[in-house]
UniProtKB/Swiss-Prot annotation:
Binding site for Cu cation A: H194, H198, H224
Protein name: Hemocyanin B chain
Functional description taken from the UniProt entry: Hemocyanins are copper-containing oxygen carriers occurring freely dissolved in the hemolymph of many mollusks and arthropods.
Consequence of changing D32E: In minor component B'
Origin organism lineage: Eukaryota, Metazoa, Ecdysozoa, Arthropoda, Crustacea
Gene3D superfamilies (alphabetical): Di-copper center containing domain from catechol oxidase, Hemocyanin, C-terminal domain, Hemocyanin, N-terminal domain
Subcellular localization, as worded in the UniProt entry: Secreted, Extracellular space
Assembly and interaction partners: Hexamer of a number of different chains, of which A, B, and C have been identified.
GO molecular function term, any single one: metal ion binding
Organism expressing this protein natively: Panulirus interruptus (California spiny lobster)
S-S bridge residues: C93-C98, C483-C502, C562-C609
Length: 657
């Protein structure tokens, strides 16, 4: 940055901008900017000479922007456009001064939800945002993550000036079988992973914003496939069958009562049990979705899609799933949105609106219309099982891998061991809900926290003993998967049946010297997961201390919040223990990373979230080598670089550190 703004100052600015988002800023420097800054005063501060700022200022001056104290949904076209106009302004800033000034100015003038969304995606995608850790959304907009009962208690605590920590219970009762797995869909870390992935890979992204989102369509498939597979693992751990796919012409069996409220806009709508899909005014007719689906099935059966100019594009090739993901979601990368529509996005809005499909009661959007809250609704996983089966039809159209495809010559995996027991348990996690309550002139803030039960596991280490029978050192890619052995009825699954339910535990690159070698890898280093985020309070303290002490701030370990929470790497399992197959596939790292920064430890969460602004670090299809049909298990068993062992995971009801 030309002004030499350090990470500590940037972090402090972002903290201040997001503090008490529903109230005017209390920080004098930001207040001064908000009153006196003119976004069009000096257009040389922007790369586009102020074109984006001019467009947004026109909307503001014409009183066309959504008012404050109103709900915001990304699935609402106009509201999304407004948020993106602010993103465009911030994204065009050359220096931090411009970024900070515009953010402070529009914070006081734009809808709070639009502002938060625009600020988050700008920090994620702009070079100026490097080094900044975005505070956990569950502390910035707690209403989206916390049930109404707890928010009410928070108000009471504030008014009576009594600090408090309040227990959040999962929705539903024991009469509802789905309640057994509510801890998964309602986990605040899982919600953050889902909402952040959609910020990292937004549907609206165009390369003119600065770079290409590599393999976005394929990652859309893989991330949601893994969420669904993980949900099925949790169901298996709770004596439930795998989630059933959604059908447009059948009833939606499971209703959902979210028991959460918007900060402004009333309660999230309830959907009763056993309702038929209805057309939704202003969104779509059910029949439209059936037509869209049949066109996608046609493309898979033909092996090609038709682009908007009428040309055919072959999808029976490695990049095929990428093209398919883009049209199913759909994103701006879709080859032909007019013809293939937007199956996933429209379906989210359709499900969100089933409580009030004709706008008769003027209800706000449902939980499915926010990425923060979508996974709470059991129908989210039914919708994604439906999408997942479309992708499976495509991957099943490829020939199975042969021995030669899978072999990494000279590389032998001799054994796999786990150092440490695979034990899961629930523990308590606290987060602040101070931002949920309003501040009065004379009412001091008191500590108000929500306490939730979250799944966790003991740390463990993989020990992979192997032999590299080649002359020299080789770069290897280690791919680790956990696969079910039996279904919910105790029937043994073939590998071909199990492979689609496997979950990715880790993927890493490592040089293996010639001769025998033992590779050790800690569960906490997984490229699939992220650690718990620092609290907003902790981010504020660290930034303030660094600024006051004149030293810089390095929070790079937390820079990405896209990734499965560390604590949820393993499925819960059962108290008596469950057995699973642990697969380790070692593949040729030079081929896998050809054309990339080979052998470099990408760290972070590249397995499901890629690397910002760079090509995806692995050339193989996501899910390799289990993503294609395996009619004959002997092919997998016959290569020396792939091995599996049976592991046992036990759930402890009482946890003692």
């Amino acid at each position: 940055d030309a002004l030499g703004t350090g990470n500590a100052n940037k972090q402090q600015d972002i903290n201040h901008l997001l503090d008490k988002i529903y109230e005017p800023t209390k920080y004098p420097d930001l207040k001064d900017i908000a009153e006196n800054f003119n976004p069009l005063g000096d257009t040389s501060i922007y790369n586009d000479h102020g074109a984006a700022a001019e467009a947004l200022m026109k909307e503001l001056n014409d009183h066309r922007l959504l008012e404050q104290r109103h709900w915001f949904s990304l699935f609402n076209t106009r509201q999304r456009e407004e948020a993106l106009m602010l993103f465009a302004v911030l994204n065009q800033c050359k220096e931090w001064y411009c970024f900070r000034s515009n953010a402070a100015y529009f914070r006081e003038r734009m809808n709070e939800g639009e502002f938060v969304y625009a600020l988050y995606v700008s920090v994620i995608h702009s070079k100026l945002g490097d080094g900044i850790v975005l505070p956990p959304l569950y502390e910035i907009t707690p209403h989206m993550f916390t049930n109404s009962e707890v928010i009410d208690k928070a108000y009471s605590a504030k008014m009576t000036q009594k600090p408090g920590t309040f227990n959040v219970s999962f929705t539903g009762t024991k009469k509802n079988r789905e309640q057994r797995v509510a801890y998964f869909g309602e986990d605040i870390g899982m919600n953050i992973h889902h909402v952040t992935w959609h910020m990292d890979f937004p549907t609206w992204w165009q390369d003119s914003y600065g770079y290409h989102l590599d393999r976005k369509g394929e990652l859309f498939f893989w991330v949601h496939h893994q969420l669904t597979a993980r949900f099925d693992f949790e169901r298996l751990s709770n004596w439930l069958d795998p989630v059933d796919e959604l059908h447009w012409d059948r009833i939606i069996r499971e209703g959902f009562a979210p028991l959460t409220s918007y900060k402004y806009g009333g309660e999230f709508p309830v959907r009763p049990d056993n309702i038929h899909f209805e057309d939704v005014d202003g969104v779509a007719h059910v029949h439209d979705l059936e037509i869209t689906e049949s066109r996608i099935h046609d493309a898979i059966d033909h092996g090609y899609i038709t682009d908007s100019d009428g040309h055919t594009i072959d999808i029976r090739q490695p990049k095929g799933i990428e093209l398919l993901g883009d049209i199913i979601e759909s994103s701006m990368y879709s080859s032909n949105v007019q013809y293939y529509g937007s199956l996933h996005n429209t379906a989210h809005a359709m499900l969100g609106r089933q409580g009030d499909p004709h706008g008769k009661f003027n209800l706000p959007p449902g939980v499915m219309e926010h990425f923060e809250t979508a996974t709470r609704d059991p129908s989210f996983f039914r919708l994604h099982k439906y999408m997942d089966n479309i992708f499976k039809k495509h991957t099943d159209s490829f020939p199975p891998y042969t021995h030669d495809d899978l072999e990494f010559a000279g590389m032998v995996v001799d054994g796999i061991a786990i150092d440490g027991e695979l034990i899961t348990f629930f523990d308590e996690f606290q987060y602040s809900i101070l931002n949920a309550v309003d501040s009065g002139e004379n009412i001091e803030d008191v500590d108000i926290n929500a306490r939730v039960h979250r799944l966790n596991h003991n740390e463990f280490t993989y020990k992979i003993t192997m032999s590299n029978n080649n002359d020299g050192e080789r770069l290897a890619t280690f791919r680790i998967f956990l696969c079910p052995i039996e279904d919910n009825n105790g029937i043994t699954l073939t590998l071909d049946e199990a492979r689609w339910f496997c979950i990715e535990l880790d993927k890493f690159f490592q040089k293996v010297p010639s001769g025998p070698e033992t590779i050790e890898r800690s569960s906490k280093d997984s490229s699939v997961t992220v650690p718990d985020m620092p609290s907003f309070q902790s981010l504020k303290e660290q930034a303030d201390n660094a600024v006051n002490g004149g030293h810089d701030l390095d929070l790079s370990a937390y820079e990405r919040s896209c990734g499965i929470p560390d604590r949820m790497l393993l499925p819960k399992s059962k108290p008596e223990g469950m057995k699973f197959n642990l697969y380790v596939a070692v593949t040729d790292g030079d081929k896998d990373t050809e054309g990339h920064n080979g052998g470099h430890d990408y760290g972070g969460t590249h397995a499901q979230c890629g690397v910002h602004g760079e090509a995806f670090p692995d050339n193989r299809p996501l899910g390799y080598p289990l993503e294609r049909r395996i009619p004959d298990e002997r092919v997998i068993d016959g290569v020396s670089n792939i091995k599996h062992v049976v592991v046992k995971i036990v759930h402890h009801l009482e946890h003692h550190d």
